[in-house]
């Protein structure tokens, strides 16, 4: 991810029949990536292999810090193996859906999450899940853990 989460820059390598279809869709989505993103991409591709090992270690450390805090607060966590976020089950908190829970979390606890329903073809399938990102500074994760403790009163 090169620590530029959300930039949505990438490439595809595929047979021409597939890349032709990809290009047709891509033309409707964007004309081209902004020049600074292209420059950053070129630099990122030249990084040594150690960068990736260190990045994976940092994410693993952050993941292993956040998940126990989430579990202590009452979430059931789905262990990620290649992402910088964790999906969680919120059914223990008694909210009717993920959107309601996410709004409560921001307003009452001061933490943002992404409603799980936004990741499903059938939103109802994710209505008792939310996603938390752990690609944050350790101090931010510490503060999140502290704030999450307030949720225990909802159990």
Where do the protein language model's features map onto the residues?
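PLP-dependent class I/II
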Residues: 1-155
């Amino acid at each position: 991810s090169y620590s530029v989460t959300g930039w949505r820059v990438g490439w595809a390598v595929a047979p021409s029949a597939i890349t032709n279809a990809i290009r047709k869709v891509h033309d409707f989505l964007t004309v081209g990536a902004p020049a600074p993103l292209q420059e950053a991409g070129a630099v990122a591709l030249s990084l040594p292999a150690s960068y990736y090992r260190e990045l994976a270690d940092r994410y693993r450390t952050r993941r292993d810090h956040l998940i126990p805090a989430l579990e202590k607060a009452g979430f059931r966590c789905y262990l990620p193996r290649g992402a910088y976020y964790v999906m969680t089950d919120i059914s223990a908190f008694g909210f009717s859906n993920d959107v309601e829970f996410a709004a409560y979390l921001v307003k009452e606890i001061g933490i943002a999450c992404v409603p799980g329903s936004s990741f499903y073809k059938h939103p109802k399938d994710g209505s008792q899940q939310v996603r938390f990102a752990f690609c944050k500074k350790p101090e931010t994760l510490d503060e999140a853990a502290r704030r999450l403790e307030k949720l225990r009163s909802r159990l």
